Design a protein with these regions (language model features):
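Flexible glycine-/small-residue-rich
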Residues: 8, 31, 58
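Structural recognition of beta-strand segments within beta-rich domains
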Residues: 20-21, 28-31, 36-38
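N-terminal acidic leader/helix
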Residues: 1-26
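A generic local structural motif
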Residues: 14-15, 31, 41-42
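C-terminal structural segments of small proteins and small subunits
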Residues: 4, 36-61
């Protein structure tokens, strides 16, 4: 199985992510334990499967 690390501003913000969804200007993720986190005013800029990275970027104001 492929679990991702969520990267924002060059730092790991959330680990073991198996689900992600864009909801408007937010990105919602869930990990293998079912715990969730919402990243407000962000977008997905890269999905790197070999390196298990889901890279987010803040939306410009």
């Amino acid at each position: 199985m492929c679990e991702f690390n969520v990267i924002l501003n060059g730092k790991v913000q959330f680990k073991d992510v198996i689900y992600s969804k864009v909801e408007g200007d937010n990105v919602v993720v869930k990990n293998i334990l079912g715990e969730g986190k919402e990243f407000k005013n962000c977008k997905i800029v890269e999905v790197d499967v070999p390196n298990t990275r889901l890279v987010l970027s803040a939306l410009k104001p």
